[in-house]
Amino acid sequence: MAAQVEIYTWSTCPFCIRAKSLLNNKGVEFTEYVIDGDEDARDKMAQRANGRRSVPQVFINDQHIGGCDDIHALEAAGKLDPMLA
């Protein structure tokens, strides 16, 4: 069974685009929550992300992974694929 991946984004955020590109290039299906200007959605994201309000915020199997730099660091360390399996 493939991992459940969720990502909170803003539509024009370059870091969000970069994180989604990594997931797309790996063929990963994910649920995207575009929260442009929606403070209620951003508050919900922050609750799940240990108070972090920056985007993107990535979750794999309901575990908070972090932002763009975090997901790319996991990829560089060879740790992302096992999480996505």
Residue ranges and their predicted role:
Residues 35-53, 82-83:
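Thioredoxin-like thiol-disulfide oxidoreductase module
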Residues 60-85:
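Non-catalytic, surface beta->alpha helical segment in thiol-disulfide oxidoreductase systems
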Residues 11, 33, 46, 68:
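Conserved short-loop catalytic and cofactor-binding motifs
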Residues 29, 51, 74-77:
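A short linear boundary/processing microfeature
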